[in-house]
Amino acid sequence: MFRGASAINLDTKGRVAIPKRYREPLHVEYNSQLVITVDIQSACLLLYPLDEWSKIEAKLLLLSDTLPAERAMKRMLLGYAHECELDGNGRLLLPLPLRQYANLGKRAMLVGQLNKFELWDETAWQHQIEQSRETIQDEEFAENIRLADFSL
């Protein structure tokens, strides 16, 4: 399981070094194979271990090719999906279209989300954190039935 936020840098070739604490689990449990795609609700990327991505693909197979919303979701997630492997130095090469989608600059944030990572431009991540704080204070958040029994 992946958790925590790590500041990382993109090099001039568009590579990111995955923090060391994640490299061994990714190598041992997932053979260093990942799939990177776009987040359809935020300007960030999603990095899935290949086994986890396979579960997403199984769900996508069940969606319609004729219903516009389902077709659009499939196009985005699958159209941008890129298989990759950590190199010997624990780096991933991010294809240019993915970097452009997430507006990634030199400084980025890799954020663990249990079964996947989000990859954000650092400034966009800070903005997202502020938006999340506002959302948590919103009445709609307090009325969310799925969150009613959630406590820390």
UniProtKB/Swiss-Prot annotation:
GO biological process, one term: negative regulation of DNA-templated transcription initiation
Quaternary structure (record): Forms oligomers.
Keywords from the UniProt entry: Cytoplasm, DNA-binding, Repeat, Transcription, Transcription regulation
Domain named SpoVT-AbrB: residues: 5-52, 81-124
Organism lineage: Bacteria, Pseudomonadati, Pseudomonadota, Gammaproteobacteria, Alteromonadales
GO CC, one annotated term: nucleoid
Cellular localization per UniProt: Cytoplasm, Nucleoid
NCBIfam families reported for this sequence: division/cell wall cluster transcriptional repressor MraZ (TIGR00242)
Official protein name in the record: Transcriptional regulator MraZ
Pfam families from the UniProt entry: MraZ
InterPro entries membership: MraZ, MraZ_C, MraZ_dom, MraZ_N, MraZ_sf, SpoVT-AbrB_dom, SpoVT-AbrB_sf
Molecular function, one GO term: DNA-binding transcription factor activity
Predominant cellular place of this UniProt entry's protein: cytoplasm
Family statement: Belongs to the MraZ family.
Keyword Repeat: yes
